[in-house]
From Swiss-Prot:
PROSITE patterns: G_OBG, TGS. A motif (Nuclear export signal) lies at residues 267-274. Expressed in all tissues tested but its expression is more abundant in testis, liver, lung, and brain. Overexpressed in several malignancies, including cancers of the colon, rectum, ovary, lung, stomach, and uterus. The gene is OLA1. Residues 304-387 form the TGS domain. The keyword Nucleotide-binding applies. Coiled coil: none annotated. GO terms for molecular function: ATP binding; ATP hydrolysis activity; cadherin binding; GTP binding; metal ion binding; ribosomal large subunit binding. Its cofactor is Mg(2+). Pfam families: MMR_HSR1, YchF-GTPase_C. The modification N6-acetyllysine is found at residue 294. This is Obg-like ATPase 1. Keywords: Acetylation, ATP-binding, Cytoplasm, Hydrolase, Magnesium, Metal-binding, Nucleotide-binding, Nucleus. Changing residue 127 to A: Loss of ATP-binding.
Length: 396
């Protein structure tokens, strides 16, 4: 397996992209690297996975529950009538080929499907199999990763020119002062993407005004990536593959801070065909485990999403929010009245609840907190909101 990521000193990227919690992550890669097989095992669905470059033409989309031991514990504790976990929306996108930005293969459709996603599972193949053709004729994951990066980069470069031309016509030659700041920002984007040949997300100092402009255009290279390396079952179990270190070195150099996660589509497929008991025996015998929980959590985090819990005998539920969400807006996820009439958030940390054993014990230990409207909700908070009910207009 690749060495553990250092990167403690890397500044986190700014949050660029659509604002909301119904965000999607797309599975992107060359044809026949295992995208549809991965999508099938991830979502337990049956998208066609034939050995054919364009067997996924329309993107298949599915919701995948986010595995979480905290959620499972709360469900075991409360034994609620209703259990609702957080979900990750995953899209399987047609295989890209070299020249996609010029419409090669299913290039334009492929790139528009990526544009509709908010993050990317960049899947690359590091297994040999004579029965599964490779569109480039040989297995070389570094080359494949570079092809994808180049296509996304070239598509962004192609988009930037017309945007600047239009703004120049109105803001510079037409003298529209309101649009001049946007023109200046797009010139900065052009310098970074076209002149310096760097993806949008690699610049970590975009300010709020610049991000506002970037969000109007949703450039492909602004989307966060998680790199998934598809290994043979044998290589995954023995934790060895000649490409892994090279891939990790490439990512650390060209996409610092991004995660590289090895997995085996063949193993995951086999595990799904076994009964729960057989699966457990097989994993123990081979001293291995499924990579899917780690992959799902990494995709969710890459979209800058997290969740808080509401928990009781009626329902245990994970409510998805963007990182940095304040208490009133988090309350609004449950009901708009909660946000409008927000009084306070009564907050327990999951760790405190588990350690103390009950809500009353958390209160007795002085760990039950009352938070106001400036409180930034943290991942895994257990919250009870207090709010004023809006007055109904009197009937005449």
């Amino acid at each position: 397996m690749p060495p553990k990521k250092g990167g403690d000193g890397i500044k986190p990227p700014p949050i660029i992209g659509r604002f909301g919690t119904s965000l999607k992550i797309g599975i992107v890669g060359l044809p026949n690297v295992g995208k549809s097989t991965f999508f099938n095992v991830l979502t337990n669905s049956q998208a066609s996975a034939e050995n054919f470059p364009f067997c996924t033409i329309d993107p298949n989309e599915s919701r995948v529950p986010v595995p979480d031991e905290r959620f499972d514990f709360l469900c075991q504790y409360h034994k609620p009538a209703s259990k609702i976990p957080a979900f990750l929306n995953v899209v399987d996108i047609a295989g890209l080929v070299k020249g996609a930005h010029n419409g090669q293969g299913l290039g334009n459709a492929f790139l528009s499907h990526i544009s509709a996603c908010d993050g990317i599972f960049h899947l690359t193949r590091a297994f040999e199999d004579d029965d599964i053709t490779h569109v480039e004729g040989s297995v070389d994951p570094i080359r494949d990763i570079e092809i994808i990066h180049e296509e996304l980069q070239l598509k962004d470069e192609e988009m930037i020119g017309p945007i600047i031309d239009k703004l120049e016509k109105v803001a510079v030659r037409g003298g529209d002062k309101k649009l001049k700041p946007e023109y200046d920002i797009m010139c900065k984007v052009k310098s970074w993407v076209i002149d310096q040949k760097k993806p949008v997300r690699f610049y970590h100092d975009w300010n709020d005004k610049e991000i506002e402009v970037l969000n109007k255009h949703l450039f492909l290279t602004s989307k966060p990536m998680v790199y998934l390396v598809n290994l043979s079952e044998k290589d995954y179990i023995r934790k060895k593959n000649k490409w892994l270190i090279k891939i990790k070195e490439w990512v650390d150099k060209y996409d610092p801070g991004a995660l590289v996660i090895p997995f085996s589509g063949a193993l995951e497929l086999k595990l799904q065909e076994l009964s729960a008991e057989e699966r457990q025996k097989y994993l123990e015998a081979n001293m291995t485990q499924s990579a899917l929980p780690k992959i799902i959590k990494a995709g969710f985090a890459a979209l800058q999403l997290e969740y808080f819990f509401t928990a009781g005998p009626d329902e245990v539920r994970a409510w998805t929010i963007r990182k940095g969400t304040k208490a009133p807006q988090a309350a609004g996820k449950i009901h708009t009245d909660f946000e409008k009439g927000f009084i306070m958030a009564e907050v327990m940390k999951y760790e405190d609840f588990k350690e103390e054993g009950s809500e009353n014990a958390v209160k007795a230990a002085g760990k039950y907190r009352q938070q106001g409207r400036n409180y930034i909700v943290e991942d895994g908070d257990i919250i009870f909101f207090k709010f004023n009910t809006p007055q109904q207009p009197k009937k005449k």
